[in-house]
Amino acid sequence: MTDDGDDTLLIGENGTFDADGHLKTVADRMTDICSGHTLSDGTQAGTIGNIVGLTHDIAKLTTWAQQYLRGQTFQQDTRYRYHQFPSALVTLYCVSQVGYAVTDHAAEIATLVVAGHHNTRSPPDPDTLSEGYGRLTPGVQETYERVSSQFEDIDANAAAEADRIISEATAGQGSWAGFKQWHERRVEPIDDAHDHLIYFDRIGDNDRREEYYDDLVRLWTALKFADQTAASGLADDDLDGRLPEVDRLEAHVDALPDGDGVLAELNHLREQARTEVMAGVDTLVETDSVGLITLPTGFGKTYAGLSAGLKAANRCDSRLVYVLPYTSILDQTANEIQSIFDVSPYSKQFTLHHHLSTTYTGLGDRYTDADIGRSPGALHAESWLSGLTLTTTVQLFESLTAPTARQATRVPALDQAVVVIDEPQAIPDSWWQIVPELIELLVNSYDATVILMTATQPGLIKYGSDTLDTRELTEDTDQYRDFLATHPRVVYDIHETVHGQAGGDHSTLSYAAAGKEVQTAASDRQNVLAVCNTRDSAEALYRAVRPTSEGESVASVELGRVIHDHVDATGELPSPVTLRELAFEEADERGADTIYAFLSGNVRPDDRALIIDALYNDDLGDASSPDPLLNSAYSVILIATSVVEAGVDVSFDTVFRDYAPIPNIVQSGGRCNRSFGGETGRVVIWRLAEPPDSNAIPSLVIHGGDGGDALPLLRETGRVLAGHVDDEGCIDESVMVSDTVDEFYAGLFEGPLDPGDEQLATAVRSASIAELEGAKMINEIDSYDDVIAGLTDTERADVLTDELTVSMLSNHAGAQVNTDADAATREVMIGHSTYLVVDARSEAYHPVFGVL
């Protein structure tokens, strides 16, 4: 720190040079991050990191930069205070002066990183740098003249300080005087193609070496991390985390009941799988293979994945990043982690990070975290420095795809980390070609241990990587299929509207007809789930199953309305146990035999979690508390979108699934008869018609293409299903979870269909940053509005106020919804983001369907 307390000024108010302050801290942290790694040309990354860290801000020594940093006015053009490019020239000089060979590639990457170290949208693009500094144009000529003036200013006012930085960066091999001579030679003649101009023009050459992108991302994200953590004041001993105690997980698993009969056999297989997976980790961490955990739904993947991940992280003395596809699953898994390990999501042991979460680490009284934005606590958590980080596939892979400045700080945490990717089949098919490239980056460049875990392995590495192989962590996956064959849990019933899919027949089922089938399936106290492809389709089916007109007296109970009635009366959300009690009381009063629930992305996250817990979670309450709704004497009908499709631990007697690719069908089937209880469950695959006020069939909206032609996923699904359906129109689960999945992916990747966006993968290989910048795994999220729906008294008091702040917003993550809102109470700006504020007790929010 300088005497005036600002660690980025380089020179304090009293003229004291900040020799051991910001630059030294950044250099030390970059060296630590890069230590032990080489760039793709063999250059030691730590050496380059040290030079970059020491020189990245050296042009702040100009009089104009110093005046700007202190809020003083100066007479020159504002561009005279810019320091990125002149600092990059010093970096290039220093790399050329070190006393051992550094290749042109390493020098180019270092120069590029410093020239773009204040970029916020993405790493610097070599083509952009070439255009800005390698073209013989008046504007570029003016830039070099201005830069030369900046160096003259440093020479006149801070030559000793500049010399000290360069000497440190080059281990005494370079000097400020040497740099000045070097620069002056390289800009002669200033009005012609001088050496600097030629050098930066060549950087735009598209013929780049393999792993150019890897090297660029490594150094740029390392600089972003080191620079931001140093500027925030984070101390070295706060740049780490602690793994949760694995013994707590072992104790939790040991305490689980053994069960009886077929459940006892299932629990034996679950523990056997977990034991095998943990044993397989010992070998996995010594290789560059990608681990696979392939288990049917309900066979204990979550415990197996956590056990394997924690063991591997302990072996590697690193951290665990556990990745899931949906925020709804994250919240459920986070609750389980907190319960098992007795940890807070705001601790150095555990971080929950997704776009709706409140993400920060409590670091004690050492820092101020009152305004959780990019405070030290938020920076620690968003940089994934805790021992265990639970996050989404979107956060992981978008952070590796031309990361923004905010995303960049988490990339160094992946070095030697263990990354468990749960439900990888949920990765959008448009990313199927780039994701293998990014996993190669993790394994080959960052020495990460990657595990893919699902019931429906998509073959991303098998079909998408030329450098990696896979290693199954369970010894005999066939035994789990055999168990399903001898103990049938569900049967898949292919509806007549789907039979013609292989031939392109798009026959559909009306919502009225579908509603009657759902109602029939729910008779005699049966629980029914129907999974739809779109939010509009789910609403249409719900209305067909249970009319929602306010004036109609129907002997049924709707959980969404029960929640809202309770909030109207008390101002607070009920607990899951209270919600059960209220639902049972209302059912008794009305003489109802069915309880209805609805879940989609339009429903507030807090309400979704509340409904899911009320349905299934038997760990809540005490001995006198009512059973979960799915275990009660009432029928439950849940109409939902894919928010329940993977990882949500609910079980129904019958599941209806709108037509979708085979992995989605299998995941929905995993919500049926999970514990092998009673009669064999039934999973019906049908094709729903377009909902009211729409002319688009939902399955084609999500999985189809223009003009009504099915995309490869649906065509291949139809072909595979047609090859396995029996004379009664059914497929056994043991076949569905294995043969059909394998054939589906083989047909996609080995046939002519070629799924995925090749342009994204090619952009990684060619380091085309401009093509990667802003790439979104789920474009729908980016196009939706950010909505804050205040329902409880506390939420409404905070979010409906004119003084809404980042802190208030963070305190109500469970009230935030991403959707295309038709109405809002008002619009507010927080930072650079726009939010629509909705009073959830107004007509803008439906008690059942959520944001309208």
Labelled PLM ranges:
Residues 1-77:
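Acidic/His-rich, divalent-metal-binding segments that scaffold phosphate/diphosphate chemistry
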Residues 284-309:
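Walker A/P-loop
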Residues 343-404:
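Inter-Walker segment of RecA-like/P-loop motor cores
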Residues 407-485:
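Post-DEXD/H (motif II) to motif III coupling segment of the RecA-like Helicase ATP-binding lobe
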Residues 443, 512-523, 536, 540-543, ...:
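C-terminal helicase lobe and adjacent C-terminal extensions/tails of nucleic-acid helicase motors
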